């Protein structure tokens, strides 16, 4: 099926999917052996795109591939293969609310747990001690009580984030599917935020959950990284070979 497809599209999350979580987000890197596999798949003619919560430019610096498309900040940013970056419009009131929320988190002594991205403020507690996690969870709940209508609060694996409505991983996948209607598409992700992407896949698309433990999901397939992830990518290569 893959070999006969006129176009193939492999869409990938990064953190927790292709790269293990680390105490410092800036230290995250691909599992060993993943980069050459992706490069080989790309050389075979599969189009590769990334959909991530990270800023698009940050992810571009971590991926040793050329000519890939990146949706960053959960779809708020789009980095074209040519390097052109576009961002969704944000209302001034939304930006001000996010700025105030980020300041509140930092002022509470949790600047180390704060991640500010375009259209998003995230609180990370995966590597916090129990007492610190309790405090961060309480702070997230307090901030969430004052959510404006155009901002949503969302839990993810290891934290909580406040994100301007309108764009998410699902809208990114829907955009790709609309521009490549004949492509056989697979989406690989690990987190709750990836469920939007699984839902947005076309009927012929394959959703792949990549994580150590199974959870309720809309994905069609479950892989435990890194070994089963390697096997899946190698199988993709084999299926495409003439």
What are the functions of these language-model segments?
Residues 5, 31, 165, 170-242:
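Mg2+-dependent phosphoryl-transfer enzymes with acidic/Ser/Thr/Gly-rich catalytic loops
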Residues 29-117:
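Active-site phosphate-binding/coordination module
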Residues 113-129, 151-163:
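Charged, glycine-interspersed solvent-exposed loop segments at helix/strand-loop junctions
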Residues 16, 70, 123, 173, ...:
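Residue-level signal for inorganic ion chemistry
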Residues 73, 79-96, 154-182:
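Substrate-recognition "cap/lid" segment bordering the active-site pocket of phosphatases
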Residues 8-10, 68, 185:
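The start of beta-strands in P-loop NTPase/AAA+ ATPase cores
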Residues 1-14, 18-22, 26, 33, ...:
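Non-catalytic pre-domain segments flanking phosphatase-related domains
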Residues 54-73, 131-151:
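Substrate-recognition/cap helix-loop segment adjacent to the acidic, metal-dependent catalytic center
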């Amino acid at each position: 099926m893959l070999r006969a497809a006129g176009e193939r599209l492999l869409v990938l999350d990064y953190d927790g999917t292709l790269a293990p979580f680390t105490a410092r987000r800036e230290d995250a890197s691909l599992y060993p052996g993943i980069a050459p596999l992706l490069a080989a798949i790309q050389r075979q003619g599969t189009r590769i795109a990334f959909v991530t919560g990270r800023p698009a430019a940050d992810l571009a610096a971590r991926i040793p591939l050329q000519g890939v498309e990146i949706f960053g900040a959960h779809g708020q940013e789009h980095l074209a293969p040519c390097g052109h970056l576009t961002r969704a419009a944000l209302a001034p009131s939304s930006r001000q609310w996010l700025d105030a929320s980020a300041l509140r988190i930092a002022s509470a002594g949790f600047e180390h747990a704060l991640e500010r991205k375009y259209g998003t403020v995230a609180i990370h507690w995966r590597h916090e001690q129990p007492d610190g996690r309790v405090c961060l969870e309480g702070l997230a709940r307090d901030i969430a009580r004052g959510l404006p209508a155009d901002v949503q609060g969302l839990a993810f694996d290891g934290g909580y984030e406040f994100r301007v409505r309108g764009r998410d991983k699902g809208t990114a996948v829907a955009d790709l599917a609309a521009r490549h209607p004949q492509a056989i598409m697979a989406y690989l992700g690990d987190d709750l935020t990836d469920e939007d992407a699984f839902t947005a896949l076309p009927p012929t698309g394959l959703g792949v959950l990549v994580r150590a433990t199974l959870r309720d999901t809309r994905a069609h397939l479950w892989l435990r990284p890194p070994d089963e992830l390697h096997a899946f990518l190698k199988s993709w290569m084999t299926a495409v070979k003439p």
